[in-house]
A protein has these predicted regions:
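Acidic, mature catalytic/reactive cores of soluble proteins
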Residues: 1-176
Length: 176
């Protein structure tokens, strides 16, 4: 594409398109997980390879800027270009939710942490974040379980899904 803008020409890295690829591979991972398909491990591997090529996993020299800044392109001649909230940010948010095992289907939040890097779970303590204003805590466990808190009472979710209305907190134990 040598006729495109300077920062979109030959030799550039188009970060937004890589993020779109990451989202597409993630969708295939979840389809394979839903079907218990034998291709799941290979798709998980491909997902991690694409993820390793993006943003915070890159060096400043490779990215051309601070790796967590939202840029659209890194030109072949160096330096990130077109700063700002590009479409890449949207894909990165969606894929991160997926990496945390969160999917919304038919009005239910489904928990399926098939892409969660277990190294993110502290040996002592929890991986904590908020999603839709609800605090989540993930801990290492021997069996993957999910619990939600409503009206001060914890409820087990054996199907690993829940209706989000009225949920005050979520906890999960995640098996290796």
């Amino acid at each position: 594409s040598g006729t495109m803008f300077g920062y979109e020409g030959l030799g550039c890295i188009y970060w937004h398109m890589v993020a779109k690829l990451l989202l597409a591979v993630q969708e295939r991972v979840f389809e394979a997980a839903d079907l218990a398909a034998p291709e799941l491990p290979a798709l998980q591997h491909f997902y991690r390879r694409v993820r390793d090529g993006l943003g915070y996993r890159k060096s400043v020299a490779d990215y051309g800027a601070f790796p967590a800044d939202p840029y659209s392109h890194t030109a072949g001649e160096g330096g990130a270009q077109q700063p700002g909230m590009t479409g890449q940010v949207k894909e990165e948010i969606l894929t991160r939710w997926g990496e945390l095992g969160l999917r919304v289907r038919d009005g239910q939040v489904h928990f399926q942490p098939v892409l969660l890097d277990r190294a993110e779970l502290p040996a002592d303590g929890a991986l904590r974040f908020t999603w839709a204003g609800v605090p989540f805590a993930y801990r290492r466990g021997t069996v993957t379980t999910l619990r939600v808190q409503r009206d001060g009472v914890w409820h087990d979710c054996p199907q690993r899904c829940f209706a989000p209305q009225g949920v005050a907190a979520v906890e999960a134990d995640i098996a290796p």
